[in-house]
Each structure stands twice: as C-alpha cells, then as structure tokens.
Amino acid sequence: MVGNLWFDRETGVTTYNVEDSEYRLLTAGADVDADAEIDPTQRAARSEGRSPAAILVSTFSDELRSGTGGLARAIGVSVKDRGAISMAGHAGTAYWFSKATGEFVTSTYYLDEYPDWVSDFNRARPAMAYADTSWTLLHDQDTYLFGDSDDRAWEADVAGFGRTFPHEYGDGESPYFTTWLTLSPAGDRLVLDFAKQALVNEKLGADDITDYLSVSFS
C-alpha cells in the first residue's frame, strides 16, 4: 500500500487504506468516533468495515500459511487497525484497539464471532484500570538529558492531555480517555497484554509448525 490513505481515481474520493464496507466490525459502535478522533487518516474513512482488500500482494503471513498448508497460525495485534491488518495479511487474523469502545476488535473478514478468550479479555475492561492514574516519569526529572525541556511552546496539548509530566488520564469518562492511553505507554501495555493472551490461548508455537505473532507498538 502506498500510504495510510490515497485519492481513488475511480471513485473520485480519498480512501483510507484498510476500510471496506463489505466487512463490518464484530463489535457494535467500535468504529471511529468522529467527534473524538484526532487522527485525520482515521477520520477520512467513509466505511465502518475493515479488511486487507487493498493489499494487492501476498504478505509474510499469507506465505507462511500457504507454505504450511494452512496449518500455521498467524495473528497481528496493534493499537491501530492498519497496523494489525497489514501484519495479519489476508490469511491471518487481525486484532486492534478500538478507541470508541476501549476493547480489542476485529472484522467479519477475519471472524464470525470472537473466541472466548477475546470476549473475556474485553469483558474485564482493562483500559479502565488506567482511570484516575497518570503517565509519570520513571526516574527523577533531573536525571534525564533533556529533563529541563519538558515544556516547550511548540508542543501540542493533544486533546487536553497536557504538555508536561505527569499526564493525567482522568476518570475514564472523557471522550478522549482512550486516545490518551494510545498516546502513552499505557497503549503499548494494553497491546502487549492482549498479545500475551493470544500467545497462550491460541497455543502459538506449541507444535512443530511455525506460527507467527506480529505485534505493533505505535
């Protein structure tokens, strides 16, 4: 794919790279929240569906699955839909974090229903564990090379997350709560925790067939 979005000469409109109206998201209300989405490429999507249809070549996941007669398991996990889908390809399974629901989701291109372990993970609402907490520095500020440069006029205060540490996540009620998570290590932790559940519950690497778990931290 040439980018996150492009102008489609046939339709005459800008197209988001993984949007596909043929394959809805499995979770209702999990698509882009236009009122709270800060990523212009996400807002450009005109469809609530997602798939790898725009990937015109075979991916590593596809070749691995093909080379093992479909026995290899391939899973892509990311905070972004385009990250997970590009790694999972056409023959794997992609999961990504929905800022609209605070859950990991996929589309009907990949699955007709969630495995129990995915439903259990989402039911526990792991994103809410960060409510009433903050993103703080790991060490004392004066131990960092540019520790005295935390506040600069050209820094953006993204959706009210603040320009200086600590960055407060708030009580979880803000429409930007999940966005703030994805802008911080909390988003990476959620992705990692979900990927670990995929590793265990899908029994990746448990036999002699090579499996593929791709994880995108963004």
Stretches found by the model and what they are:
Residues M1-I209, S218:
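His/Asp/Glu-rich, glycine-adjacent segments
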